[in-house]
Amino acid sequence: MAGEIHRITKETLEKLKAEWTELTTVGRTENARVIEAARLLGDLSENGDYHAAKDHQGKMEARIRQIDHVIRNHELVERDGNAGTVQYASIVQIVYEDDADDDFQEFFIGSIEEKPDEVLVASPTSPLGSALLEKAIGELVEYEAPSGILRVKIVGIR
């Protein structure tokens, strides 16, 4: 993670700041309360509630560190006004060579922090993401995957 720059939109930055604030205030306070209540139940070595609360605390602290890293190491980007081509933050519908157009997969071109729930993510620096940038609907795109050269057709952009 060191030195990594996260390209995100202003909206995502604001969302991350709000999540960080929520986790570092309400989240930590509530988790401390749950840990203390579980501690009062007795022997900690066999206390499932206590161990679950401590596990949750670890995951929450990891998320806080992750958000903090993104906030400290971000570059704001704006989506280009050219809706006819794939841009940062576009959702692209692609089909692999020889597949039917209605058998598409959707990829969000951007950061995992911005990912809409219903789609996969392709980083703009990944082989697929970089190959799709600036391309238009109907174009055939080649990119190198671990299994070799793959060809996809862009069937939709939103």
Locations of regions flagged by a protein language model:
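N-terminal cationic and glycine-rich segments that engage phosphates or anionic surfaces
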Residues: 2-59
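Short amphipathic alpha-helical segments, especially helix-boundary/capping motifs
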Residues: 8-13, 66-67, 105-106
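General N-terminal targeting signals
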Residues: 18, 25, 30, 40, ...
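Internal alpha/beta loop-helix hairpins
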Residues: 48-80, 84
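Generic structural "secondary-structure junction" signal
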Residues: 10, 25, 43-46, 73, ...
